[in-house]
Amino acid sequence: MNGEYKTLANKSFESNVLFFGQEACLPNYTYKGNNVRDSYVIHYIQEGKGTFAAANHPATVLKAGDIFILPKGTPCFYQADNDQPWKYFWIGFSAGIRIEAMLSGSLLAQKCYLRQVQNGHIYADLSELYKVLHIPNSLINDVLLGSLIYRLFYDLLRWYPADATNIKVKSTEQFNLAVSYLQENYSTGCTIMDLCHYLNLSRSYLYTLFKTHANTSPQKLLTKLRLEDAKQRLSTSNNSVQSIANMVGYKDSFTFSKAFKRYSGASPSYYRKSIGI
């Protein structure tokens, strides 16, 4: 077989390319490495044909002009044809939540392949991205690389949108993950920006996510978690206001007391007295 495989040290932008390569396969060649990956690998078939299957998807014959993806954490099988073995190039993307969010809105994520994209935007995007990946790193090339990555996912979303039901399910998963993070970390003093970094989502997208699923904001939920816990501690313990403030994620008692009064209508000390503690 003739081919190349290269890893990419560039870590700029939120959507990272980890590796890329090309292969002209021998007849009936089957990949025998670890077929469950922690990345997303998009293949474009340049010549020939072969058989591709991903878990929970039927096997299908793909040919020149088609693309397929090896999704994160999904067993896949792909084999070159005996008479017309395929040649393809691939680009591997990191498995961050931002990549997953963009992919989830595309038909590629649902089917794991797209047919005959060679005359459209997707091939143009992949081809140009693959070409730029061979250029040595520099600031201007890093900027170009980032723009090409986002253009690729933009065109996947525009020209091959996913079933709306699947998009809604993915959005629900992101929301549930965000809520779980806040529930588990509010006492550590985490911020909404910490949550954004954890999920690799923008603050504006996160806000929309919470308004859609809970008609509230992330900050309001974080405040509620902290202050409901504080109310419980004020009514069941003799810990000082400062100690309770620290226990629920506030660095100082002044900020805590101000937030508590705004939330409950009374200062922590008055609230404690009102319930007889």
Swiss-Prot record:
The keyword Transcription regulation applies. Gene3D superfamilies: Homeodomain-like, Regulatory protein AraC. Transmembrane segments: none annotated. GO terms for molecular function: DNA-binding transcription factor activity; sequence-specific DNA binding. PROSITE patterns: HTH_ARAC_FAMILY_1, HTH_ARAC_FAMILY_2. Residues 193-214, 241-264 bind DNA. Residues 176-274 form the HTH araC/xylS-type domain. InterPro entries: AraC-bd (IPR003313), Homeodomain-like_sf (IPR009057), HTH-like (IPR037923), HTH_AraC (IPR018060), HTH_AraC-typ_CS (IPR018062), Tscrpt_reg_AraC-type_HTH (IPR020449). It comes from the Bacteria. Keywords: Activator, DNA-binding, Transcription, Transcription regulation. The keyword Ligase does not apply. Involved in the regulation of the raffinose-operon. This is Raffinose operon transcriptional regulatory protein RafR. The gene is rafR.
